[in-house]
Amino acid sequence: MTSDHRDALFSLELESPDPDEGGVADGGESDTDEDLRDNDDVVMPGTNEAEAEDDDPEEEDLNSPSTSSLPMVSTISATAVVSGTPTATSSTGAVTVALPAGSAVPVSVIPVDSDPKWHRMTEIVHQRPPIDDSRRLFQRLWTDEDEIELLRGFLDYMTMHRGSSSHPPDTAPFYEQIKSKLQLDFNKNQLVEKLRRLKKKYRNVMSKISSGKEVFFKSPHDQSTFEISRKIWNQTGKIIGFEDNNVMDFEETNNHHNTTNGNYSTFNSPSSNPTLELDSENGIEKKLTMSSSSVSRKRSRSRIGKIEEDNKPVITPSDGPIASNVNLNEAAAVGIGGNLGGLIEETVKNCVSPVIKEMMNGTTSMMMAAMGGGFPGLGGGGGGGGGHGFGSLSPMFTRPFNFGFGVEGGGNKAVADERWRKQQILELEVYSRRLELVQEQIRTTLNELKTMPSGI
């Protein structure tokens, strides 16, 4: 029994592996594990993942002095073959460049997948910026066709509302009217600004014409714009919200001299004494001769009135009623709907101005005669009291001539004084009748204006 038990124990010891001989017993390691551990180029599958991530040179800073000064390129990614199965330690693919030790060539790692952040920055730099919406504001809003349509609509609006009331028309109704005709998106301020610019453009052309310069239109559109603008702003009256005080008034531009050729593209100014054909306020064409000195400068209303008065013939008492009748016939010819203000003003100027002038001349001569400054008589007699002053052209309120015949204080002088007195009475009666006609015409016109409907 003892021998059999001993033999069994001995056989068991022979079959069990000896731990000193490298066998695996009770959780010991085999020779294969030791060989794999001694190999530096092989990664054990049982190693800690955190240690593998710390040893991964891809996570290190490439610009650090510790890595840039290494003579040997460390392995970025390695593949270990354990039990015939490849295992990758890095999830990101990369290109590994290895150089021998002691090489001074700089090392660069080129990643296969580029950084998306760098990709986005490159797109922002090289992408063409979009067109800014603010630049579209400076694009032209009104085309040539729109300008013509706008001026025509404004001309119709002014023609319809001119003379309908004492107040000037407003631009608000016109904005509502023209907005439906134009295929544009504009507001009232843009409309008023466009009309103001067109008016200023027209005034600039008229100022060049008044200064004697030749005006050439660049295109047929400019010519058409000027012709329509002349029909609009060549009339009196202003528009609410459309006043422009920086330009000349109608009176300064209505009498501008302009002679046009067939296509109205050139305005020439004659050099001396041009004969102008103008439309007066009552619609009657008149020919007026003006000196060249008044052509080269702008004229105010008083200047124009003075030129017209100087160029008119002297109206004698005999032709006064005839002139008044002519004016009345002209007013009847053009109709009551015309502008009667100019007719009344012209009638008063034709009738009253000579009366005032004659009275002023007569008063001056009487004052000079009273002061002893009259001219001596033709027959001698230096201070003979019968001298006639500077009012000799006007016999009103003047003393009779002393021709030197007879003796002062004789009967001939008394007869001459009586004849002059009768002549003065006749002249004053003529002027009185003329003034009565003017007053009657003014009353008639006033009654017609009061009874006239406002829509005409």
Curated annotation (Swiss-Prot):
State the family named in the UniProt similarity comment for this chain: Belongs to the GeBP family.
A Pfam family (short name) is GeBP-like_DBD
Q: InterPro entries per the record?
A: GEBP, GeBP-like_DBD
Sorted keywords for this record are:
Phosphoprotein, Transcription, Transcription regulation
The Phosphoserine modification is found at S16
Disulphide-bonded residues: none
Lineage top rank: taxon = Eukaryota
By what name is this protein known? Probable transcription factor At3g04930
| Presence of keyword Iron | no
Protein source organism: Arabidopsis thaliana
Q: Which GO terms describe its biological process?
A: regulation of DNA-templated transcription
Q: Where is this region: Disordered?
A: 1-71
**Compositional bias segments (type: Acidic residues):** 15-38, 50-62
